[in-house]
């Protein structure tokens, strides 16, 4: 007996089998994959941080 892992598509919530039969995993389709990429590119999604580091003295573009 083989265990099949099923995850929900992060874009639409549709169930996706985690395996070679699902080439866009964790997404259900290329469309959902591109929607997610567009959200990251438009900065609608971001990785949470502990604070605003834009004014940090540790970061400098000067060499």
Curated annotation (Swiss-Prot):
Cofactor: Zn(2+)
GO biological process terms on file: regulation of DNA-templated transcription
Superkingdom as given in the UniProt entry: Bacteria
InterPro entries: DNA_gyrase_inhibitor_YacG, Znf_NHR/GATA
Keywords: Metal-binding, Zinc
Keyword Zinc: yes
The record's free-text note on cofactor binding: Binds 1 zinc ion.
GO molecular function per UniProt: DNA topoisomerase type II (double strand cut, ATP-hydrolyzing) inhibitor activity; zinc ion binding
Range of residues in the leader sequence: none
Binding site for Zn(2+): 9, 12, 28, 32
Stored NCBIfam families: PRK00418.1
Known partners and oligomeric status: Interacts with GyrB.
Record-stated family: Belongs to the DNA gyrase inhibitor YacG family.
Family matches, as HAMAP family: DNA_gyrase_inhibitor_YacG
PANTHER family in the record: DNA GYRASE INHIBITOR YACG
Function noted in UniProt: Inhibits all the catalytic activities of DNA gyrase by preventing its interaction with DNA. Acts by binding directly to the C-terminal domain of GyrB, which probably disrupts DNA binding by the gyrase.
This protein's name: DNA gyrase inhibitor YacG
Source organism of the structure: Salmonella typhimurium (strain LT2 / SGSC1412 / ATCC 700720)
Gene name linked to the record: yacG
